C-alpha cells in the first residue's frame, strides 16, 4: 500500500493547469492560479513562523482566503485546526488551548491573550520568506483537526490524516461516479468536514467548485438553473427552501445529485423531488468518518424511505448490542470501519480507546439494518439535537445553565421547530429568584446563537431514575405537551 502521494494541489495544477478550479460569484480561478496563490500565502505564513508539524487555528468564512490558507498549511506541513465561526469566544479559546495551536489566522476581529492572532490581510501585507514546500504528503500524517462534541458535551479534536481525506474522496467517487463536466456547488461551511471534503474532491478530481460564501437560498436556486451545477450538498432545510423557490418548475437534467445529510428527510419532501426529477442521495456520516460513510442511492429514495443506505465501497458497517453483532431489524449501536475513519482524538487517549476498537468506530448512534443491509438511523447519539444541520449537545448547554448562581438543576432536550427541524428547550430547577429572560440572556453570553435554548421552563424537580440519571424522554414528553 502506498505511504505517500504527490502534493495534491501542485499535482493537479501540473496535470490540468488551465481548468477552472474555483468560481466565487463572477471570479474564476484555474488550478495553476490557485497553486500560485497558495504558494504566496505559504511564503507569508512561513515569515510569521509557521513550520512543519505545528498546529494553526483557522477562523474564517467560506471564501478564496480560507481555501488558500487551508492549502498553504498543507504545503508547509502544518496541521489546520478548523474553527466554527458560529461559536462563542469562550468556546473558541477553549478549543485553541486544547489543540495547542501556535497561532490563529482569521478574517475576523478576535483577541486572545496567550495566542498570536494574525488577520489574513495582515499576513498578506507582511514580508515573504522562502518556504519549504512539501513535495509529497505522507498518508499517515495529520492534515486537519476538527472539533466535535461527545455525549459528555466536552469537545474533542478529531484528527484526520491525508489518508483519511484521500479515502473519503475515493469512496465518494466510486459511489457517485465522475464526469468531465461535474461542478459541485459548495454552500456548506468549510470548517465542517462536509464542506472541507469538497475542497479535497476539488483538487483530487480536478472538478470545478462553485463556492457560495454565505448561505443564500435565492442565489443557490438561480445557480442550479444557470451555472451548470451537477452536484450539491444540502440538509433538509436547504432542500425545503429550494423547493419553495422552484414552485411548479424543475431543475436542469444536468443536476445529477443532491447529497442530503443531517438526518433523514420527510417522505412528502422526497415525493416532491421524485415528481420533479431531482435525484436525492441520503447520507450518513460524521466528522470521525471524514464526511459520508453511507449513502442511499436515488434509485431507493422512495422504496427505502428513512434509510441512509449502504456503506461506501471500501467501508464496513454493523450493528452491535453489548459487544455482539445483532441480526437484521435488531436495534443497536452503529459501528463502522474504513480507511476514511479517524485514528483518534487529539490528546484524548481514553476517548480514543473507548470509541475505536480494532479499527471499528463506535459511533454512539442507534440504528438497525434491514434484511438487505440498508441502514436506518434511529437516534443521532440519542440525546443529540440537530438544528439546521448543526449538531447541538444538551450536556454543553446544561453545563452553562448550571454555572448560573440561581440554577440548581438543568436538563435540555430538542423541541420541534418548523424552520430548523429542532431547537433546544431547557428545563430548570431554581435555587433562587431568576426569570426565563435572565436565563436565556445568560446563555446568549456563553453559547453560540444556535445553541441558546428557545425556551426555559421551571420545574420543582427534574425527572430522574433510581440512579438519579436524568430521564430526558420525560422532558421530551413535557415539550410535546407544550
Swiss-Prot record:
Q: What is this protein called?
A: 2-succinylbenzoate--CoA ligase
Give the E.C. number(s): 6.2.1.26
Family per UniProt?
Belongs to the ATP-dependent AMP-binding enzyme family. MenE subfamily.
Pathway assignment reads: Quinol/quinone metabolism; 1,4-dihydroxy-2-naphthoate biosynthesis; 1,4-dihydroxy-2-naphthoate from chorismate: step 5/7; Quinol/quinone metabolism; menaquinone biosynthesis
Reactions catalysed, as given in the entry: 2-succinylbenzoate + ATP + CoA = 2-succinylbenzoyl-CoA + AMP + diphosphate
The major lineage groups are: Bacteria, Bacillati, Bacillota, Bacilli, Bacillales
Q: Look up the record and give one Gene Ontology term from the biological process aspect.
A: menaquinone biosynthetic process
The record's function comment reads: Converts 2-succinylbenzoate (OSB) to 2-succinylbenzoyl-CoA (OSB-CoA).
Query: Which keywords accompany this UniProt record?
Result: ATP-binding, Ligase, Menaquinone biosynthesis, Nucleotide-binding
Q: Which InterPro entries match?
A: AMP-bd_C, AMP-bd_C_sf, AMP-binding_CS, AMP-dep_synth/lig_dom, ANL_N_sf, ATP-dep_AMP-bd_enzyme, MenE
What is the top EC class of this enzyme, as a single word? ligase
PROSITE patterns noted in UniProt: AMP_BINDING
User: Which one of the record's GO molecular function terms can you name?
Assistant: ATP binding
What PANTHER family does the record tag this protein with? LONG-CHAIN-FATTY-ACID--COA LIGASE (PTHR43767), NONRIBOSOMAL PEPTIDE SYNTHASE PES1 (EUROFUNG)-RELATED (PTHR43767:SF1)
Amino acid at each position: 500500500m502506498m505511504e505517500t502521494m504527490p502534493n495534491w494541489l501542485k499535482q493537479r495544477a501540473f496535470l490540468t493547469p488551465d481548468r477552472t478550479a474555483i468560481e466565487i460569484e463572477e471570479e474564476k480561478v484555474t488550478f495553476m492560479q490557485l497553486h500560485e496563490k497558495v504558494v504566496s500565502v505559504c511564503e507569508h505564513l512561513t515569515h510569521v513562523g509557521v513550520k512543519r508539524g505545528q498546529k494553526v487555528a483557522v477562523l474564517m468564512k467560506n471564501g478564496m482566503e480560507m481555501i488558500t490558507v487551508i492549502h498553504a498549511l498543507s504545503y508547509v506541513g502544518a496541521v489546520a485546526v478548523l474553527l466554527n465561526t458560529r461559536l462563542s469566544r469562550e468556546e473558541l479559546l477553549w478549543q485553541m488551548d486544547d489543540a495547542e495551536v501556535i497561532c490563529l489566522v482569521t478574517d475576523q476581529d478576535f483577541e486572545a491573550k496567550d495566542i498570536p492572532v494574525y488577520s489574513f490581510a495582515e499576513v498578506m501585507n507582511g514580508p515573504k520568506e522562502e518556504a519549504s514546500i512539501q513535495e509529497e504528503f505522507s498518508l499517515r500524517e495529520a492534515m486537519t483537526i476538527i472539533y466535535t462534541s461527545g455525549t459528555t458535551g466536552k469537545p474533542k479534536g478529531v484528527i484526520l490524516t491525508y489518508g483519511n481525506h484521500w479515502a473519503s474522496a475515493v469512496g465518494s467517487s466510486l459511489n457517485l461516479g465522475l464526469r468531465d463536466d461535474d461542478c459541485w456547488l459548495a454552500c456548506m461551511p468549510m470548517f465542517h468536514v462536509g464542506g472541507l471534503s469538497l475542497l479535497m474532491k476539488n483538487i483530487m478530481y480536478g472538478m470545478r467548485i462553485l463556492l457560495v460564501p454565505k448561505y443564500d437560498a435565492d442565489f443557490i436556486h438561480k445557480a442550479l438553473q444557470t451555472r451548470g451545477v451537477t452536484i450539491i450538498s444540502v440538509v433538509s432545510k436547504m432542500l425545503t427552501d429550494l423547493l419553495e423557490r422552484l414552485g411548479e418548475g424543475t431543475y436542469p437534467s444536468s443536476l445529477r445529485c443532491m447529497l442530503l445529510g443531517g438526518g433523514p428527510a420527510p417522505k412528502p419532501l422526497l415525493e416532491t423531488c421524485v415528481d420533479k426529477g431531482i435525484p436525492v442521495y441520503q447520507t450518513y456520516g460524521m466528522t470521525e468518518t471524514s464526511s459520508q460513510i453511507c449513502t442511499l442511492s436515488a434509485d431507493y429514495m422512495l422504496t427505502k424511505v428513512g434509510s441512509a443506505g449502504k456503506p461506501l465501497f471500501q467501508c464496513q458497517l454493523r450493528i452491535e448490542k453489548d459487544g455482539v453483532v445483532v441480526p437484521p431489524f435488531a436495534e443497536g449501536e452503529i459501528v463502522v470501519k474504513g480507511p476514511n475513519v479517524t485514528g483518534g482524538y487529539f490528546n484524548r487517549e481514553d476517548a480514543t480507546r473507548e470509541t475505536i476498537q480494532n479499527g471499528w468506530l463506535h459511533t454512539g448512534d442507534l440504528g438497525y439494518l434491514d434484511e438487505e443491509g440498508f441502514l436506518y438511523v434511529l437516534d443521532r447519539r440519542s440525546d443529540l439535537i440537530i438544528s439546521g444541520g448543526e449538531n447541538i449537545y444538551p450536556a454543553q448547554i446544561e453545563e452553562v445553565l448550571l454555572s448560573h448562581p440561581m440554577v440548581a438543576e438543568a436538563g435540555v432536550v430538542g423541541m420541534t421547530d418548523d424552520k430548523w427541524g429542532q431547537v433546544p428547550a431547557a428545563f430548570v430547577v431554581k435555587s433562587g429568584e431568576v426569570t426565563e429572560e435572565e436565563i436565556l440572556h445568560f446563555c446568549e453570553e456563553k453559547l453560540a446563537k444556535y445553541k441558546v435554548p428557545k425556551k426555559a421552563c421551571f420545574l420543582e424537580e427534574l425527572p430522574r431514575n433510581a440512579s438519579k440519571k436524568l430521564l430526558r424522554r420525560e422532558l421530551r414528553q413535557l415539550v410535546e405537551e407544550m
